[in-house]
């Protein structure tokens, strides 16, 4: 069995805000369109893993990616499509495959897919939990040079200070308004 890298991919504003009420607060800002393109270019062709709340916000699976959904309330044994896909090693990008944990998603991808990495795409709580639990091998983080906080009930912030991630790459776009940082475990 091969080992794959689980790579978190997320964005934050200059204050560390990564989400509000299960949404991206910058999604309608024209200055952040670069990041959506970066996300698509980076994840296309690879398996993606998301939490249940992120799954609910999608209308359909993301194209050209095998889509896994972490739902701890759903039994893997009840998922006929994933059992069939594991047996035949044939997954498609028109379905969501439900798993009970990030660990299970990693195991299935390592056993049944020809991939060397998979991306954990959100939501914010799922990504932060993976960082805290040391479940990510790498992290790609976009930082916008702007604050997006508005009066909200449910902001989620990121703090990497207490992790063992080290920066491996840094690139700026849009006249320094968007910064892409790549991290790996130290």
Where do the language-model regions lie?
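Enzymes that bind and transform nitrogen-containing heteroaromatic metabolites
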Residues: 2-186
């Amino acid at each position: 069995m091969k080992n794959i890298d689980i790579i978190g991919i997320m964005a934050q504003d200059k204050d560390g805000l990564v989400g509000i009420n299960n949404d991206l607060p910058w999604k309608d800002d024209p200055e952040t369109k670069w990041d959506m393109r970066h996300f698509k270019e980076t994840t296309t062709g690879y398996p993606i893993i998301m939490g249940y709340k992120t799954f609910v916000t999608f209308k359909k699976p993301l194209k050209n990616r095998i889509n896994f959904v972490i739902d701890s309330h759903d039994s893997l044994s009840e998922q006929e499509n994933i059992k069939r896909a594991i047996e035949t090693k044939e997954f498609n990008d028109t379905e969501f495959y439900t798993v009970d944990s990030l660990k299970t998603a990693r195991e299935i991808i390592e056993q049944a897919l020809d991939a060397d990495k998979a991306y954990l795409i959100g939501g914010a709580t799922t990504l932060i939990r993976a960082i805290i639990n040391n479940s990510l091998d790498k992290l790609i983080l976009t930082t916008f040079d702007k604050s997006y906080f508005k009066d909200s009930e449910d902001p989620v912030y990121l703090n990497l200070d207490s992790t063992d991630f080290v920066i491996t790459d840094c690139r700026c776009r849009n006249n320094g308004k968007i910064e892409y940082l790549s991290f790996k475990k130290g």
